[in-house]
């Protein structure tokens, strides 16, 4: 039976993945600080390691290796025997429609630049043990509330707007959203099939901001002025990954998930 190590005890992705993956695999979850204290032999029993922890300076500042937690962790090992799932970002690309894995790399901010630099290091270090996932926007709720969050979610921003209860305006860009359920299922299939390589993880379809707000809360939707825009619009092609794992993810699944979040 495959055994999974998740690094990032209380992160959004880590805590949700722990619940989902535990249905199919043996899963352990530790904080980044805890795994750094472990000796190399501790990791021999794990088939896959997923790092979901991140330093706030890695998100907001220019690249500095002392804030690159993936590099710090993997530098513990002379030889890596487990598969390493690197949670990359769609921000390594310039926003446009139908971005493929071989599209030009053109990071839009420091976070995107830092992720690409880390990916380059991991490709050299891990070779065929690397799974680098260039992820679109993941929708879902945090299991652990009121904690230090180094990376704001779309749903965090939505709840903030909802609490303010004011009339606001949004650019009605289209985005590529994927739910935490869809994302977790994709990770499970990648583990089961021992997929390796670089892949976009996305719905692969346009969802306009106005659509998703309406699915989440029709009352809030009525208070927002939406302006046509394509400045920050993007979708990621997911065909390469779906050919490997053969699952069906749909826009209707995203719609149903959104409606279940606000009750």
Predicted regions and their residues:
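Mid/C-terminal beta-alpha module of Rossmann-like enzyme folds, strongest
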Residues: 184-232
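Conserved Rossmann-fold NAD(P)-dependent oxidoreductase catalytic core, especially the SDR/UDP-sugar
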Residues: 72-108, 131
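N-terminal Rossmann NAD(P)H-binding glycine-rich loop of SDR-like oxidoreductase domains
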Residues: 2-23
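NAD(P)-dependent short-chain dehydrogenase/reductase
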Residues: 120-174
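Conserved C-terminal active-site "lid" loop/helix of NAD(P)H-dependent oxidoreductases
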Residues: 180, 208-214, 225-263
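NAD(P)H-binding glycine-rich loop region in Rossmannoid oxidoreductase-like domains
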Residues: 35-75, 90-92, 96
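Active-site helix of classical SDR
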Residues: 110, 114
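Alpha-helical substrate-binding/gating segment
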Residues: 155-168, 173-200
